[in-house]
């Protein structure tokens, strides 16, 4: 699984002209799922996300997790995170999982992340054409890949 985490002042997702979900201060997370992802990837990633210290403490130092900061999370499915640009100029998405694999994993990820956060995680709609708006705070943007844990 690959995620791009952005610390935001606010974020929203619109589908067919209607706001599906919106959050105030917190994280907007793009998540891409590949064929080899599993429950273990979800477990590791959820723990990592809720404990990631990217929010400012009283001294302005990034030292607080989203749990401590009481922030919100908006999760958007994003198969293009698995784009390969190795050959030519047109990205290949061969590593992105097919819907029959990615939808259940995406739903489980959102459910488990809600449990880890202790409140509802807002989402987009899997496979929909979405318009995502956000105000990146910092900016702070973190990329995590469960197959390359750095």
UniProtKB/Swiss-Prot annotation:
EC number per UniProt: 3.1.1.96
Domain of life assignment: Bacteria
Location(s), subcellular: Cytoplasm
Keyword tRNA-binding: yes
Assembly mode: Homodimer.
Protein name as catalogued: D-aminoacyl-tRNA deacylase
Keywords: Cytoplasm, Hydrolase, RNA-binding, tRNA-binding
UniProt xrefs under NCBIfam families: D-aminoacyl-tRNA deacylase
Position of sequence motif Gly-cisPro motif, important for rejection of L-amino acids: 138-139
Residue intervals passing through the bilayer: none
GO cellular component, one term: cytoplasm
Pfam families: Tyr_Deacylase
CDD domains reported for this sequence: Dtyr_deacylase
GO molecular function: D-tyrosyl-tRNA(Tyr) deacylase activity; Gly-tRNA(Ala) deacylase activity; Ser(Gly)-tRNA(Ala) hydrolase activity; tRNA binding
Alphabetical list of SUPFAM superfamilies matching this protein: DTD-like (SSF69500)
Domain-related comment: A Gly-cisPro motif from one monomer fits into the active site of the other monomer to allow specific chiral rejection of L-amino acids.
Gene3D superfamilies from the UniProt entry: D-tyrosyl-tRNA(Tyr) deacylase
InterPro entries: Daa-tRNA_deacyls_DTD, DTD-like_sf
Organism: Bacteroides fragilis (strain YCH46)
UniProt GO BP: D-amino acid catabolic process
Presence of the UniProt keyword Metal-binding in the record: no
Enzyme kind, highest EC tier: hydrolase
Catalytic activity annotation: glycyl-tRNA(Ala) + H2O = tRNA(Ala) + glycine + H(+); a D-aminoacyl-tRNA + H2O = a tRNA + a D-alpha-amino acid + H(+)
Stated family: Belongs to the DTD family.
HAMAP family, A to Z: Deacylase_Dtd
Highest classification ranks of the organism: Bacteria, Pseudomonadati, Bacteroidota, Bacteroidia, Bacteroidales
């Amino acid at each position: 699984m690959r995620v791009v985490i952005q610390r935001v002042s606010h974020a929203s997702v619109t589908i067919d002209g209607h706001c599906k979900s919106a959050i105030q201060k917190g994280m907007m997370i793009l998540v891409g799922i590949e064929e080899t992802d599993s429950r273990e990837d979800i477990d590791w990633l959820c723990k990592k996300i809720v404990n990631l210290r990217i929010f400012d403490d009283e001294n302005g130092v990034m030292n607080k997790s989203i749990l401590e900061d009481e922030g919100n999370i908006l999760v958007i499915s994003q198969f293009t995170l698995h784009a390969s640009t190795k050959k030519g100029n047109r990205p290949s998405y061969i590593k992105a999982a097919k819907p029959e694999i990615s939808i259940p994993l995406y739903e489980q990820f959102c459910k488990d992340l809600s449990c880890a956060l202790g409140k509802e995680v807002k989402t987009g709609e899997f496979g929909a054409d979405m318009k995502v708006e956000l105000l990146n705070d910092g900016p702070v943007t973190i990329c995590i890949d469960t197959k390359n844990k750095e």
